[in-house]
Amino acid sequence: MIRFIHAIFVLAFLTANCYANSSVSVVDFGASETGKSVAEKLRAQFRTAGDFLVADADLTRSAAMGVGYAGSLNLTLDEARDLGAALASDFYVLGDTRVLRRSSFEKPVYFEAYCTVFLVSSRTGRLLTWSRPSFNNAEPGKAYGLLLQNLADLSHSLIIAMRRATEDERLERTVIPTSPAPLIEAAPDDEKVAAAQGMRLPRPFKRLRPEYPDSAALADAEATVDVAAEIGADGEVGDVQIVRWAGFGLDQATVATVKQMHFFPALKNGTAIPMRVLLRYNFRKPPKD
């Protein structure tokens, strides 16, 4: 009985401290003082919570500059992993913060204070979650103040996401597959190379375009989303993975669209074969009617 209680205590201790060994970097939210201030306040919120080690702001800034990071929120998995390796933390936060003068039919003049936040896993390069809290007020200072008041809730949601990702990635590393993954050939770079190898690339029956979601419209987001899609020998879409993320709901819109598509399968020497293809979608805000 004593051993059982001791084992439970050790398990609880390890669970409580597994996050403390993980770290997070917060990259400045743009070059403005507003962006730097919000990033620093977010670091302070993380430190107060105590769940994760928080990287030094100056070291984070130097590491990001050292690999040429210039503020993009539209990265490939490789680019995201490279940035994470330079920052030397388990997770990192990217973003953008501004206070903008706006106008509308209802309000001739008002101010919007917003903060775009992307949480990224350094190990996988995946975009774990994104958020864009926004507050309007007739005075810029009050709009900004409302945004700052929201940072406690924002940091709490990010901490929950990091806890979940820590556990998920730990399980990914420990799970042993019961059978080897099927070998799926990657598509050659272009049709000429494919033809020289006796192959024909998959072709969609009908090209579908993802809808531009309202969440992207609110942010005036323009970005490129790349997905790697496995097309079976029957022409049906299997696994779809984001390899260049953009946030703002664009990734989800892309995956949902690709999964609705049907293809003429790839051929090799006249025989249908499964193939992994890269599909790219460029998003631009539609013009106003």
Where in this protein do the model-derived segments appear?
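Second-shell loop/turn segments in exported
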Residues: V27-E33, V67-G71, P140-Y144, V240-W245
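Bacterial N-terminal signal peptides
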Residues: I5-N17
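Short beta-strand->alpha-helix linker/helix-N-cap micro-motif
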Residues: S22-A31, R43-L73
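C-terminal/domain-edge helix-coil "capping" segments
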Residues: Y19-S25, T34-A49, L83-A86, Y110, ...
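Short, solvent-exposed, polar/charged sequence segments at loop or secondary-structure edges
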Residues: A55-S104, Y110-F111
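Charge-biased low-complexity segments
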Residues: S23, P140-G141, I160-D289
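Scaffold/interface architecture of coatomer-like assemblies
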Residues: S104-F105, R126, N269
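Envelope-exposed proteins and targeting segments
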Residues: S22-S25, V38, L42, G50, ...
